Amino acid sequence: MHSRSCLPPLLLLLLVLLGSGVQGCPSGCQCNQPQTVFCTARQGTTVPRDVPPDTVGLYIFENGITTLDVGCFAGLPGLQLLDLSQNQITSLPGGIFQPLVNLSNLDLTANKLHEISNETFRGLRRLERLYLGKNRIRHIQPGAFDALDRLLELKLPDNELRVLPPLHLPRLLLLDLSHNSIPALEAGILDTANVEALRLAGLGLRQLDEGLFGRLLNLHDLDVSDNQLEHMPSVIQGLRGLTRLRLAGNTRIAQIRPEDLAGLTALQELDVSNLSLQALPSDLSSLFPRLRLLAAARNPFNCLCPLSWFGPWVRENHVVLASPEETRCHFPPKNAGRLLLDLDYADFGCPVTTTTATVPTIRSTIREPTLSTSSQAPTWPSLTEPTTQASTVLSTAPPTMRPAPQPQDCPASICLNGGSCRLGARHHWECLCPEGFIGLYCESPVEQGMKPSSIPDTPRPPPLLPLSIEPVSPTSLRVKLQRYLQGNTVQLRSLRLTYRNLSGPDKRLVTLRLPASLAEYTVTQLRPNATYSICVTPLGAGRTPEGEEACGEANTSQAVRSNHAPVTQAREGNLPLLIAPALAAVLLAVLAAAGAAYCVRRARATSTAQDKGQVGPGTGPLELEGVKAPLEPGSKATEGGGEALSGGPECEVPLMGYPGPSLQGVLPAKHYI
């Protein structure tokens, strides 16, 4: 009796344990990591149905999905990351993501979406990152993103937008609208007070409205490259906290005046490449005392004496010049094509100058200079009753350039919410945040119950070393990835590799996703003799934030011409050499055909005349010469040959098969003879 009463509970417990273990991985997917499902390159038009309910990360990119059925995400309340990129999705039903109450990352890049409605992202109260780039979005309803009050990143590049609705996103840190067709942005359209990075490249902007950036007090990274700006926008002067400014590709800008960029003392990276500049302001040191990266390639520089300061300034201030091999002189003719950094002072054609040096005569004792522990240059004490004496020196050497003093004060209002600014060990400012706030600029409040991993720590880790890139062939570059295999304490999900051609007209960014286990990767299908910028970003597992982006530049080698050159090369340089033999062969073939036809007709006439003299068909002169031999294996000919060759086009058949040595390789291709 006792054993019978215990049997049903034991069976019930066994069934429960087996039921929990049967919960497997969806077909065509991988579940190697806990609470993570990878369905990469799975061929299916719908979302897999049998996803475990405790899944935190679901990756179903490049699956061929065309539609999202209502209820396809039901039963996944703990899902935090959903990757639906590189599919064929054309529309999103209203409320399709509403069951995903804990979703924080949604990637819909590279689909075929046309519209975003007010109901598309309903219920996603915890969403922090939304990627909608490389779609066909033409219309976004006003208020489509208003409910996403926790959104930190919104990416809409490479779409077909013509009008942008007002955006009210108080916590947004990154907004990417690049490569749409939005020729104008009205003032007040961006209600994003905390945005740090704003990318407006390739919109077709002709000007920037004066009030466009009025509320963006936290803006540090501005990209307005590849637009149609005709002059430096004056609205940029008010962005005192700007550290990175990209103006490349605005080919109508022909001049930069010092007052155009006045007040940007915090600027560290400036990109003015591919403009129409013939010179640069000589007081860049005072304008940008913290500048460490300058891109000025593909400008028609006039390398005369007013530009002689550039090379010494770059070297003395340790400024990194991006793409120095493309920063060349266009004028005057003697310097055309030369690298700007390779020119000496005398190469700029500066006249022999008479320099008046002021030599102070000191009556009092000169004390030793006071050395400061800061990065500022040593200062000399004031001198007592100095008198000056002028001495004239004839010199052709460049004027001595004093290094720019390092500023000791931080930009105004750079730290938010009461944070204090200070200079770090490398003379880069950093913010000390008060209790209750966090972030690089103290921009994010620490909320109760919020995980610290969702907000970047302060200060940020030091940037990675530059990438190691080496050329493999004229169309490929090899990127070394060993750094992500050795000594990495963060569990990596994958690597994101992006590259773009800096030399050609198409500068669109190409994005690849690589496994984290690769030691190196070869980027193929590149253009020869071109400069490429390649960046790699490690992607952490789960909710771990992205690592620092490591970038580098490399050149593909020159294409080598050989005896086995492809057809595309022969079209450019060797086209006449190929046409001349072909024309000669055609001419010889025509002459040979005409001569043979003439002989056949004359022989036929002779044979007709001899028929009256009882001469048999087998003893004709054409048969003795062997002209009729090719007719036997060819088309059906009569024994006499006279009927088959009389009149009509049949007489041309033996000419096509005539075994002439000079025309053997040409005649088969000439079917029109």
Swiss-Prot record:
GO terms for cellular component: cell surface; extracellular exosome; mitochondrion; plasma membrane. Residues 1-24 form the signal peptide. GO terms for biological process: cellular response to hypoxia; cellular response to redox state; negative regulation of epithelial to mesenchymal transition; negative regulation of transforming growth factor beta receptor signaling pathway. Residues 463-559 form the Fibronectin type-III domain. Residues 370-389 have a biased composition (Polar residues). Coiled coil: none annotated. Residues 406-443 form the EGF-like domain. One of its GO terms (molecular function) is transforming growth factor beta binding. Residues 25-53 form the LRRNT domain. The chain crosses the membrane at residues 577-597. Residues 25-576 are extracellular. Residues 299-352 form the LRRCT domain. Disulfide bonds join C410-C421, C415-C431, C433-C442. The keyword Nucleotide-binding does not apply. It is found in: Membrane. N-glycosylated. Induction: Upon retinoic acid-induced differentiation of smooth muscle cells in vitro. Residues 369-389, 608-648 are annotated as: Disordered. LRR repeats lie at residues 54-75, 78-99, 102-123, 126-147, 150-170, 171-192, 194-215, 218-239, 241-265, 266-288. This is Vasorin.
